[in-house]
Amino acid sequence: MVGSGAAGSASSLQGNGSNSSGLKSLLRSAPVSVPPSSTSNQTLSLSNPAPVGPQAVVSQPAGGATAAVSVNRTASDTATFSKYLNTAQALHQMGVIVPGLEKWGGNNGTGVVASRRDATSTNLPHAAGASQTGLGTGSPREPALTATSQRAVTVVAGPLRAGNSSETDALPNVITQLYHTSTAQLAYLNGQIVVMSSARVPSLWYWVVGEDQESGKATWWAKTELNWGTDKQKQFVENQLGFKDDSNSDSKNSNLKTQGLTQPAYLIAGLDVVADHLVFAAFKAGAVGYDMTTDSNASTYNQALVWSTTAGLDSDGGTRLW
């Protein structure tokens, strides 16, 4: 994702992530050794991780020199806890600050926040003029939340309590409370976290963090195709990205950078999840992109892609221009 470099709000959305399909690792953190029987509180520096006991408390120092995360676990949570620490390390390597997570106490046993506006304004800092809805900058506006969409967007405070649903995880998911001055938006859908506007990866439009089920590690990879929505929507997003890639291989994921195209056609000004649909808003014309498929017989081979309008994309309804 092309980074805007401006401070923004992180619209943190929850899912358990345990049903994510195996993903190829573009950036993989080193394993973290977690002893099964320690009871002391220790501080973990993500830049220099150390073994952590059942009560891991990591603070975020002034100036953001070290990313931080606070996670509570029991002795039986060793494997899952290690997975979250690996996720935090990967995020830190990408320049994303993981704020301290407080133990989630729930709300009447449900863990559901009334509205995302309340959740984001209470738990995460906002830049001046930044939207609290995840739909780009401008006047904050709250979309109507159905029972389904509310479940998808209300996780800023932490995960659901253990035992509330089949999607509950006993540990806080470090992905649910992310903030960085150059990370404008986050969204969660179908077991994947979409991270846009990271200044540390300026040659790519957006990234997805997922969990490799085989290794249990968090993996970073360039998301160049959406796995949900219609074919029309997928084609539109692939065009916006400037190239098409149907695989998650490291070589193809780095195709954009290695071929010298560092500015895709549009900048995505915002994204959100509403009623279980991923919504991109305010594509802005910025440059020329190319479909970099290696198949010379493809209809879009080396096709130049240029736009001069502002367009929106809904994963349910396709594209619309205004």
Curated annotation (Swiss-Prot):
Pfam families tied to this protein: MgpC
InterPro entries: MgpC
SS bond list: none
Compositional bias segments (type: Polar residues): 120-134
Sequence ranges of Low complexity compositional bias: 1-48
UniProt region (Disordered), positions on chain: 1-59, 118-145
Family in the record: Belongs to the MgpC family.
Protein name, UniProt field: Putative MgpC-like protein MPN_367
Native species: Mycoplasma pneumoniae (strain ATCC 29342 / M129 / Subtype 1) (Mycoplasmoides pneumoniae)
